[in-house]
Amino acid sequence: VAGNSGPTSGQEITWEEITEHAKSPEPIVEITTATKRKRRVFTFGEKDFRKAININRPTKLMLSFVDYLKYDDRHKTSWDSLTQETKDWITTLESKMNVFFNFLSTGPNPEHTIIRKTNGELAVKAQIGQ
């Protein structure tokens, strides 16, 4: 989002804060396609997430931008290879929201996807497009 997109339960933060929190050696930033401005970014909005879950009743969930939590998780392809801090954050969120993330995105490409079984164990490495 580059402009005002309405209310959100997340708190607006800066790309610099994300870069610092993730301990990234390089700046993390997203630019909008049309205006070429920095995309607005927010903390995870638990209230919005819960509302979306209640309205949509999804059967599978994907959590994107896991690599924005910790740069060390960038391009990981297995649950076991994620940092303990990231795994703890995800499992705490899952428990709190009573959900399970079947897919975790750790980078910009399809192969940077972790597919999990419902018991939280790694199912298979994503083989998208093969």
Please report, for each region that a protein language model flagged, where it lies by residue.
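Non-transmembrane, aqueous-exposed alpha-helical and coiled segments at domain scale
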Residues: 1-130
